[in-house]
Curated annotation (Swiss-Prot):
Comp. bias regions, Basic residues: 765-774
Species this chain originates from: Neurospora crassa (strain ATCC 24698 / 74-OR23-1A / CBS 708.71 / DSM 1257 / FGSC 987)
GO CC, any one term: condensed chromosome, centromeric region
Protein name: Shugoshin
Stretches with biased composition (Basic and acidic residues): 109-120, 382-398, 482-495, 549-558
Composition bias, Polar residues: 297-318, 399-409, 595-604, 640-651
Protein task: Plays a central role in chromosome cohesion during cell division by preventing premature dissociation of cohesin complex from centromeres after prophase, when most of cohesin complex dissociates from chromosomes arms.
A GO BP entry: meiotic chromosome segregation
Length: 774
């Protein structure tokens, strides 16, 4: 045992030694590994530093490469620029040589002095010019030469001296003349030439002047429609220089010294000379072909040329004015200044076509003398007013305008076509275009104008744009007859547009409506209190005593039955009494009750024997109804239907009740608002009969059947009638619950009335009848 223990102890000691050795070995290895790691980490750090250094060197090298490349490019560009500069310098030297060669080309011969050569060779600056007086003289000479040779004068630029044309006052005077002139402001005056002296005009060929005179008298009115008249007014156009295009006139311009005094001379009015009228035969002269303002060759008034001119000579001053305006030779031109209302302003426009007036719409109709009006115009006028002034007024107007000729700024005014002699108007061939029966005033106004080209047909002289009809017709009013006038009748009744007035409708007649209106006017309209006051009943015994009434009792009324029978007798469905307003039907108060079937049936009984028979029948009906009445609380489960029948009541009585119900329901016009009485008039309905019956009492079975039959008949008749009220049918038809309660109350009343004497029965019926009539 002891050896065994020793061996165990020895094995334990060996194991502990081995573990110690292993621990030391591991520690030594760990130290080696840590040393290797440290050396490796140091080496890694060194390599990283080397990489960073190499990268920085690489960047530096790249920057250097880029810098060198840029230097190369700059060197290349510099070389190109240097070459261009060299070429430029060479070209400048060559251009200098060429300019010297060109400068030597314009030199005068070498005989003259060098100073003169240099002075002429160098370009003269704009400052060193000739003095203004010498330049003005040269310009005046050049203008005079141009006028004599028929050329246009030269146009100078950059003038430093004052212009010799018009100042601001003259321009303002021209503007005022343009406003006061008879020319149209839209089209403008005819073309003019300025600075034309009457004394400087020398006629070269007298025969064209005569031809021009005859030609211009013909074309006095033709140029109004000419497109050449569309010129700018003189106030807007630039001032023109003094030249004239007429080849038959030789114009002279005064020298420069005389132009200074020219405005003062022009301000004074020219001397007036008496007009010289030509005595030669003007109609035989021909028209010159080369007229400046050429117009349409086809003159519509050519056959009347000779007669117009002859009549113009006979008229004295007026013809002299017109001839003075149309003359062209210098002797005839003197008459222009006489006939002008004002002397011409200095340097103002002098028209070459002085006889032409631009088209302008007249402010008022032309005044034509009564002596020279055409006969057809008088026939066409037919009583219309026309403003006619005699011929002496025109002469006085011309004299007034001549009296005003001493104003400062004047112009040659051309007389309007309204002041022309009127014998020409009478000889115009009257056509359908000028004179029509429907347009008398326009015909007389249009005959004054003697255009070669007439104005458009759709525009008259007064600016009207439509031609009226040939015949004067009366004005047609489309507002009458009105629909209200078509539908109006002798009375104020309204008829149904669908069914028509010829069909018999359930409406009260005009007499009934008058009675109802009288009752409505007398009755108050307040609904404050319900009073029991009997009102006088209408006696309908005379209407219900016939045989027709018996037939009406047996059958139900049809909805299309007429108001009057063929014999002229009112049927039983007509109620002549006053009816209650619809508001009394719609209220649910127990005091407002509708008369029962028995009360309504008593209204139609005419005689005493018939009332006794019906009283016996009603007593029997009331007894059987009272036996079958079963009351039930209002909140019960099973409510009996309104159409449930009672087997104890005989069918004859039901038929009689249905007939009476239908007749009375048909007599009530549900849609007649005017026929309904006020609640005060409908109030007396025997409140004593309603006091015994509780409000929430169940209606009897028999009364339910009767009320259902009555309601169906009422709705049937109401659907066939036209509406003439503002109330709806559902508001006017009596409610079924009200019918049931009222029937139950009336049945109890009938039992009480049956026990009374015959006199009390008749009194109660009479009072019920009165209440029903209300």
């Amino acid at each position: 045992m002891a050896r065994l223990n020793e061996q165990a102890m020895s094995s334990v000691a060996l194991s502990t030694d081995n573990l110690e050795l292993l621990r030391r070995k591991f520690l030594r290895q760990n130290r080696d590994i840590a040393r290797v790691n440290s050396t490796q980490s140091l080496r890694i750090r060194g390599l990283e530093n080397e990489c960073a250094r190499l990268l920085s060197e690489n960047l530096e090298l790249r920057g250097q490469v880029l810098r060198l490349e840029k230097e190369l490019q700059d060197n290349a560009a510099r070389r190109v620029a240097d070459h261009a500069l060299e070429v430029k310098a060479k070209m400048e030297t060559q251009l200098a040589e060429l300019s010297s060669l060109l400068a030597s080309l314009g030199e005068p011969p070498s005989k003259r002095r060098l100073s003169e050569e240099r002075r002429y060779a160098q370009p003269r600056p704009s400052v060193h010019r000739s003095p203004p007086l010498r330049r003005a003289r040269q310009e005046a000479d050049q203008e005079l030469l141009a006028e004599q040779e028929g050329r246009l004068p030269p146009i100078y630029e950059n003038k430093t001296y004052a212009r010799a044309t018009m100042n601001s006052e003259e321009i303002l005077a021209l503007c005022m003349q343009a406003d006061d002139s008879n020319d149209s402001p839209d089209i403008g005056p005819p073309p003019v030439s300025r600075f034309v002296e009457d004394d400087m005009v020398i006629p070269c060929s007298p025969s064209p002047n005569k031809n021009a005179e005859a030609e211009e008298t013909e074309t006095t009115e033709q140029v109004e429609e000419s497109p050449r008249a569309l010129q700018v007014p003189p106030s807007l156009s630039p001032p023109k220089l003094d030249y004239d295009r007429r080849p038959n006139m030789i114009l002279f311009s005064p020298p420069k010294e005389s132009r200074v005094a020219e405005p003062s001379k022009m301000f004074s009015p020219p001397p007036m000379e008496p007009p010289k009228q030509s005595t030669s035969a003007v109609p035989s002269e021909t028209i010159r072909a080369g007229l400046k303002r050429k117009l349409n060759g086809d003159n519509q008034n050519e056959p009347n040329k000779a007669t117009k001119l002859q009549q113009g000579k006979e008229n004295g001053n007026e013809t002299g004015i017109k001839k003075g305006l149309s003359a062209r030779d210098p002797h005839k031109r003197k008459s222009i200044k006489e006939t002008a209302t004002k002397p011409r302003a200095p340097l103002s426009a002098k028209s070459t076509n002085e006889h032409i007036v631009s088209p302008k719409k007249p402010a008022k109709p032309h005044q034509v003398a009564d002596d020279f009006k055409p006969v057809k115009v008088h026939k066409a006028s037919k009583g219309k007013e026309k403003v006619d002034l005699p011929a002496p007024d025109k002469k006085s107007a011309v004299e007034e305008t001549q009296g005003n000729s001493t104003s400062a700024f004047t112009k040659v005014e051309i007389l309007p076509p309204a002041l022309e002699p009127t014998p020409e108007v009478a000889e115009i061939p009257e056509t359908d275009i000028l004179i029509t029966p429907g347009t008398p005033e326009r015909a007389s106004e249009s005959t004054v104008v003697t255009h070669d080209t007439p104005p458009p047909a759709h525009i008259s002289s007064n600016g009207e744009t439509s031609r009226p009809s040939r015949r004067a017709r009366a004005a047609i009013s489309y507002t009458e007859p009105n629909l209200r006038d078509k539908m109006r009748r002798p009375t104020k009744e309204l008829f149904d547009a669908v069914s028509g007035e010829g069909k018999f409708l359930h409406r009260p007649t005009s007499q009934q409506q008058q009675q109802q209106r009288k009752g409505d006017e007398s009755a108050p309209t307040s609904v404050s209190k319900v009073k029991v006051e009997p009102s006088p009943a209408v006696d309908i015994s005379s209407l219900t005593s016939s045989a027709l009434f018996e037939k009406e009792k047996e059958k139900e009324p049809q909805p299309d039955e007429g108001i009057l029978s063929p014999n002229g007798i009112l049927p039983s469905s007509v109620d002549l009494g006053r009816r209650r307003r619809a508001s009394s039907f719609s209220t649910a108060a127990p005091a407002m009750t509708i008369p029962s079937v028995q009360e309504q049936s008593t209204l139609n009984l005419p005689a005493a024997d018939e009332t006794d028979e019906n009283a016996a029948v009603e007593a029997q009906i009331q007894k059987e109804l009272s036996n079958s009445i079963t009351t039930r609380p209002r909140g019960g489960k099973g409510r009996q239907s309104m159409s449930r029948s009672v087997p104890t009541i005989p069918t004859e009585n039901y038929e009689h009740e249905d007939a009476q119900l239908s007749t009375n329901s048909a007599s009530v016009d549900l849609y007649d608002f005017a026929s309904c009485a006020s609640p005060d008039s409908a109030a007396p309905q025997l409140e004593a009969t309603t006091g015994d019956v509780p409000v929430n009492k169940k209606a009897p079975k028999g009364s339910r059947r009767a009320s259902s039959a009555a309601s169906t008949e009422t709705t049937a008749t109401a659907s066939a009638k036209p509406r003439s009220s503002r109330k709806r049918a559902s508001m006017l038809v009596p409610k079924k619950s009200l019918w049931a309660e009222e029937l139950a109350q009336e049945e109890e009343d009938e039992e009480d009335v049956g026990n009374d004497s015959g006199g009390s029965l008749s009194k109660g019926r009479a009072s019920r009848r009165r209440s029903m009539m209300l």
